[in-house]
């Protein structure tokens, strides 16, 4: 499971659309998204309610505690909303140690209310944890002792009986309504492959549940089966995270392929760089470098999997090698081309793209004093490793090659020993 945060606008859009389909609950929520490109006249033509009611506006940037941070404005008319957005759009703010400009807002009708409830649903490998409180809102953390929680195993179904402990202390006149809403929200959670859903708070408007503030995360590995249900969904970067040009290029490649191509720069001046096959293996290699005491020298996190074709691997490897060889300083560097033992991927085929990139970057590799360490197993691995050995001899670049007879992370220790060993 890969939990990806989505904007509040999309969380509410999905809940409203699918709660009607799955539980016959018609939420009366309305919302509009505002960015730098928004034309307020055009937006008002599309959402006529914007000009006829008092409004709430707040950043929709994947961070919480907006109310406590003075970033929520209430009871504004549309002109005041436009002024509020204009004054803050592109302005850098700091939230929990992360700094970034505000780029996206959500605008909604102002809803007067007295009671605030809290609801969250979180999934894990064994089931779902569902929490509810009659004391929701910005002080939820201070009132966490009033939150009721149940755990629903994956093999069990949600029923009113299961939900009963959460709502047992509610007044009778709202108990069934809120119970049905919790069950409906859970149905949406499961059907759309949410991994996290939180409403803090939701209230009752004319006796009907009404989410005021909402957060959501989706399991993006389920995108293939939820394309139509999710619609035009966006997975924004975490607040404060800005992609470099190289990361953005790889992200674009990843979006266009059925394979997985991931690349994150951790330390541009690091001397240990990785290009690892497999999501699990890529984490193990990074953790091993850290466990050996050299996390500060780790230049990147990189992972390719899902049998990318040779051209995709070539473009991917070019970027990794370019970053790994930038600004030579006379000290040795190491590139780990690692992986476990593949089940189906043709190792020789994927190595062809890497070999082409290494051959293209010969001058950069030598200038940066790069030492290359290869470890891989799987279908056709002997051919792939033989080609790697031949490449090392051809280029005159230090290149050590290991197969499945060697431990997967043994090359991490060899790379560290190499770059830390003083020149004779």
UniProtKB/Swiss-Prot annotation:
Q: EC no.? A: 2.3.3.8
Where can this protein be found?
Cytoplasm, Cytosol
The top EC class is: transferase
Q: Where is the signal peptide?
A: none
Give an example GO biological process. lipid metabolic process
Catalysed reaction(s) here are:
oxaloacetate + acetyl-CoA + ADP + phosphate = citrate + ATP + CoA
Instruction: Check the record and name the Gene3D superfamilies matching this protein.
Output: 3.30.470.110, Succinyl-CoA synthetase domains
Q: Which residues bind citrate?
A: 343, 345, 376
GO (cellular component) term, any one:
extracellular region
Which GO molecular function terms does the record list?
Answer: ATP binding; ATP citrate synthase activity
Q: Which Pfam families match?
A: Citrate_bind, Citrate_synth_N
What keywords tag this UniProt record? Acyltransferase, ATP-binding, Cytoplasm, Lipid biosynthesis, Lipid metabolism, Nucleotide-binding, Transferase
Give the family, as the similarity comment puts it: Belongs to the succinate/malate CoA ligase beta subunit family.
| Role description | ATP citrate-lyase is the primary enzyme responsible for the synthesis of cytosolic acetyl-CoA, used for the elongation of fatty acids and biosynthesis of isoprenoids, flavonoids and malonated derivatives. May supply substrate to the cytosolic acetyl-CoA carboxylase, which generates the malonyl-CoA used for the synthesis of a multitude of compounds, including very long chain fatty acids and flavonoids. Required for normal growth and development and elongation of C18 fatty acids to C20 to C24 fatty acids in seeds.
Description of how the protein assembles with itself and partners = Heterooctamer of 4 alpha and 4 beta chains.
PANTHER family annotated for this entry?
Answer: SUCCINATE--COA LIGASE [GDP-FORMING] SUBUNIT BETA, MITOCHONDRIAL, SUCCINYL-COA SYNTHETASE BETA CHAIN
Instruction: List the protein's name.
Output: ATP-citrate synthase alpha chain protein 3
Per the UniProt record, the lineage of the source organism begins with: Eukaryota, Viridiplantae, Streptophyta, Embryophyta, Tracheophyta
Gene name for this UniProt entry: ACLA-3
């Amino acid at each position: 499971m890969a939990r990806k945060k989505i904007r509040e606008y999309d969380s509410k859009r999905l809940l409203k659309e699918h709660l009607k389909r799955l539980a016959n609950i018609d939420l009366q929520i309305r919302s509009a998204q505002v960015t730098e490109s928004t034309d307020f006249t055009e937006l008002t033509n599309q959402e006529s309610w914007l000009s006829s009611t008092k409004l709430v506006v707040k950043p929709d940037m994947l961070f919480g505690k907006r109310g406590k941070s003075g970033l929520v404005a209430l009871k504004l008319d549309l002109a005041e909303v436009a002024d509020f957005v204009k004054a803050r759009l592109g302005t850098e703010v700091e939230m929990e140690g992360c700094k970034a400009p505000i780029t996206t807002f959500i605008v909604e009708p102002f809803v007067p209310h007295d009671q605030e409830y809290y609801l969250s649903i979180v999934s894990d490998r064994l089931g779902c944890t569902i929490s509810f409180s009659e004391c929701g809102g910005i002080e939820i953390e201070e009132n966490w002792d009033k939150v009721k929680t149940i755990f629903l195993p994956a093999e069990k179904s949600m029923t009113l009986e299961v939900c009963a402990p959460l709502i047992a202390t509610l007044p009778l006149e709202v108990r069934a309504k809120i119970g049905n809403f919790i069950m409906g929200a859970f149905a949406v959670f499961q059907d759309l492959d949410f991994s996290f859903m939180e409403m803090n708070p939701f209230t009752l408007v004319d006796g009907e549940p009404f989410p005021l503030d909402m957060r959501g995360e989706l399991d993006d590995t389920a995108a293939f089966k939820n394309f139509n249900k999710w619609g035009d969904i966006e997975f924004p970067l975490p607040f404060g995270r800005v992609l470099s040009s190289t990361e953005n290029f790889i992200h674009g490649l990843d979006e266009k392929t059925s394979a997985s191509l991931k690349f994150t720069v951790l330390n541009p001046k690091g001397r240990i760089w990785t290009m690892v096959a497999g999501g699990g293996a890529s984490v193990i290699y990074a953790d091993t470098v850290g466990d050996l005491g050299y996390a500060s020298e780790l230049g990147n996190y990189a992972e390719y999997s899902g049998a990318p074709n040779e051209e995709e691997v070539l473009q991917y490897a070019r970027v990794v090698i370019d970053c790994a060889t930038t600004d030579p300083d006379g000290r040795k560097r190491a590139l780990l081309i690692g992986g476990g033992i593949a089940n189906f991927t043709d190792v020789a085929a994927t190595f062809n793209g890497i070999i082409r990139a290494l051959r293209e970057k010969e001058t950069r590799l030598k200038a940066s004093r790069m030492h290359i360490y290869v470890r891989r197993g799987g279908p056709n691995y002997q051919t792939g490793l033989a080609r790697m050995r031949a490449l090392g001899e051809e280029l005159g670049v230090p290149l050590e090659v290991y197969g499945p007879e060697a431990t997967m992370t043994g090359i991490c220790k060899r790379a560290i020993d190499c770059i830390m060993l003083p020149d004779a």
